[in-house]
Amino acid sequence: MKQKTHKGAAKRIKISGSGKLRREQANRRHLLEGKPSKRTRRLKGTEDVAPADVKRMKRLLGKA
């Protein structure tokens, strides 16, 4: 049977043009008043998926 894309992972992880896996950072959705501005600025933007997780994530996305 054909492997299906894991939709939860597909919504959270994007593949860059060079093939790197990028993800949004956690802790920036709500309850931000109690967090320092420095921390919320640091959490902006995307980050690479950890090397230990890349193989598993590619399999979930059907790119393995």
UniProtKB/Swiss-Prot annotation:
Gene Ontology cellular component list: cytosolic large ribosomal subunit
Stretches with biased composition (Basic residues): 1-14
Listed InterPro entries: Ribosomal_bL35 (IPR001706), Ribosomal_bL35-like (IPR021137), Ribosomal_bL35_CS (IPR018265), Ribosomal_bL35_sf (IPR037229)
GO biological process assignments: translation
Gene Ontology MF annotations: structural constituent of ribosome
Region Disordered: start-end pairs: 1-50
UniProt keywords, alphabetically: Ribonucleoprotein, Ribosomal protein
Chain intervals with Basic and acidic residues compositional bias: 21-36
PROSITE patterns (alphabetical): RIBOSOMAL_L35
Protein family per UniProt: Belongs to the bacterial ribosomal protein bL35 family.
Protein name: Large ribosomal subunit protein bL35
Organism, scientific name: Corynebacterium jeikeium (strain K411)
